[in-house]
């Protein structure tokens, strides 16, 4: 739970986040997780959401890592939700935390077993680089994710290594570090007092009238005169987007399109 300001003209309000800790032990909301193929990750998720909350969403949670190949017990099925007092139909009992195991393997492990040249195993053509994690509680996936429970999970390998100065000549050497920028887009609705609202009973879905990027309404990113890697994620429940880069005169700018739905394309496409 965090006090959050979506825009300077809007009041501070409570949102629900996953909270990690940096190297100094400081809390960090919805941390971007950096992983590598062949290096498993065990993530322990504590649920400290209040049972007597106000507003939309539910304090029962089920963490789902979207699109990665994971064991079924760590997939975050909708029925795997839990809290200190409740548990879903596919959980044995309530609890304070749940461990998630992410082996970080490629698809096709049976067809392409581990070897000296492929220590992670699987089909490296199936590598996924840009993933995200979010809540997937039964009947409340959209509400809980919209309330703030979503973040990035970036996974690297020898080709997409996360190092633009990689000495490996076969690496793509894409922009990295501060120049590799994940951007999560969510459309949201706010009432006349500037408080976020969500109609979780509308079967047709909810379209927001404000677009947030990484939790801020229409933020500005100051950039250097160099190449950037932008990872664009639609983290909202209903809206579709068409993205364009324009200059101050509203003229279209070119960019290189390198991935879709988490996968690198066979070859980059130049937007003209």
Model-derived features: where do they sit?
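Histidine- and aromatic-rich segments of cupredoxin/plastocyanin-like copper-binding domains
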Residues: 70-93, 101, 185-272
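Divalent metal-coordination and catalytic microenvironments
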Residues: 43, 63, 135, 183, ...
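Short solvent-exposed strand-capping/beta-turn motif centered on an Asx-Ser/Thr pair
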Residues: 38, 46-50, 233-238
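Low-complexity, Pro/Ser/Thr- and charge-rich linker/hinge segments at domain boundaries
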Residues: 157-177
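Surface-exposed loops/turns
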Residues: 35-37, 127, 224-225
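N-terminal edge beta-strand
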Residues: 13-33, 209-219
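Extracellular/periplasmic metallocenter environments
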Residues: 48-163, 269-272
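Short, hydrophobic/aromatic beta-strand segments
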Residues: 8-10, 44, 51-62, 147, ...
């Amino acid at each position: 739970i965090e006090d959050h300001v979506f825009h300077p003209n809007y009041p501070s309000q409570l949102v629900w986040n996953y909270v990690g800790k940096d190297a100094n032990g400081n809390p960090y909301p919805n941390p971007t997780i950096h992983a590598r193929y062949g290096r498993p990750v065990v993530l322990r998720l504590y649920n400290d959401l209040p049972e007597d909350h106000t507003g939309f969403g539910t304090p029962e949670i089920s963490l789902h890592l979207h699109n990665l190949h994971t064991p079924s017990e760590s997939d975050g099925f909708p029925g795997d939700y839990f809290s200190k007092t409740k548990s879903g139909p596919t959980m044995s009992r309530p609890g304070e935390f749940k461990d998630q195991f992410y082996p970080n393997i490629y698809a096709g492990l049976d067809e392409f077993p581990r070897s000296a040249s492929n220590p992670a195993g699987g089909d490296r053509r199936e590598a996924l680089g840009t993933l995200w994690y979010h809540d997937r509680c039964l009947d409340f996936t959209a509400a809980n994710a919209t309330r703030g429970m979503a973040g990035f999970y970036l996974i690297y390998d020898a080709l997409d290594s996360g190092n633009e100065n990689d000495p490996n000549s076969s690496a793509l050497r894409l922009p990295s570090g501060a120049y590799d920028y994940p951007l999560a887009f969510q459309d949201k609705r706010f009432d006349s007092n500037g408080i976020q609202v969500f109609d979780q009973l509308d079967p047709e879905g909810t379209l927001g009238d404000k677009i947030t990027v990484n939790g801020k309404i229409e933020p500005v990113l100051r950039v250097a005169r160099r190449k950037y890697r932008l990872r664009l994620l639609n983290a909202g429940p209903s809206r579709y987007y068409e993205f364009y880069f324009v200059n101050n005169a509203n003229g279209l700018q070119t960019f290189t399109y390198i991935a879709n739905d988490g996968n690198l394309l066979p070859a980059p496409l130049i937007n003209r």
